[in-house]
């Protein structure tokens, strides 16, 4: 699997959390008028190491 992430495979809970977070962010951004109160929440979520790692692995470097 070219998308395999050994660190995430070793911690499936972090992987699931990061994936769910990324899906929630994608859904929020897909709204015609994204809810501005969600911005601090998004900033907090992106500050989490597991989320940063997933984003780097799947969006930036992928």
Swiss-Prot record:
UniProtKB keywords: Amidation, Ion channel impairing toxin, Neurotoxin, Secreted, Toxin, Voltage-gated sodium channel impairing toxin
Domain of life, per lineage: Eukaryota
GO terms assigned for molecular function: sodium channel regulator activity; toxin activity
Tissue: Expressed by the venom gland.
Region of interest called Disordered, as start-end residue ranges on this chain: 1-20
Keyword Secreted: yes
Main location: secreted
Bias-annotated ranges (Low complexity): 11-20
Subcellular location: Secreted
GO CC terms of this entry: extracellular region
Propeptide boundaries: 1-34
Residues modified to Asparagine amide: 61
Acidic residues compositional bias, start-end: 1-10
Function: Vertebrate-selective toxin that causes pain by targeting voltage-gated sodium channels.
Family the UniProt entry places it in: Belongs to the formicidae venom clade 1 family.
Protein name: Myrmicitoxin(1)-Pr2b
Lineage, top ranks: Eukaryota, Metazoa, Ecdysozoa, Arthropoda, Hexapoda
């Amino acid at each position: 699997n070219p998308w395999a992430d050994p660190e995430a495979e070793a911690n499936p809970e972090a992987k699931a959390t990061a994936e769910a977070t990324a899906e929630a962010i994608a859904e929020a951004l897909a709204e015609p008028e994204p809810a501005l109160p969600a911005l601090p929440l998004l900033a907090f979520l992106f500050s989490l190491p597991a989320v940063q790692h997933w984003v780097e692995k799947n969006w930036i470097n992928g």
